[in-house]
Amino acid sequence: MTATIGFRPTEKDEQIINAAMRSGERKSDVIRRALQLLEREVWIKQARTDAERLRDEDVSTEPDAW
């Protein structure tokens, strides 16, 4: 189910949205692309956290799984 989210952009928000708009795009398309970029940012942050946590792991000392 799709939910509607209310958003009242500031003047600066409007400038950013307008600058990011591609030909034929609506403002909602720009915001959707921005959300996808945020999703990627969250994924990268988690990947870095995982890499830091596993940095001392040496899988070469473990038996092969196959």
Curated annotation (Swiss-Prot):
It comes from Mycobacterium tuberculosis (strain ATCC 25618 / H37Rv). It comes from the Bacteria. This is Putative antitoxin Rv3098B/RVBD_3098B. Forms a complex with cognate toxin Rv3098A/RVBD_3098A. Keywords: Toxin-antitoxin system. Putative antitoxin component of a possible type II toxin-antitoxin (TA) system. May neutralize the effect of cognate toxin Rv3098A/RVBD_3098A.
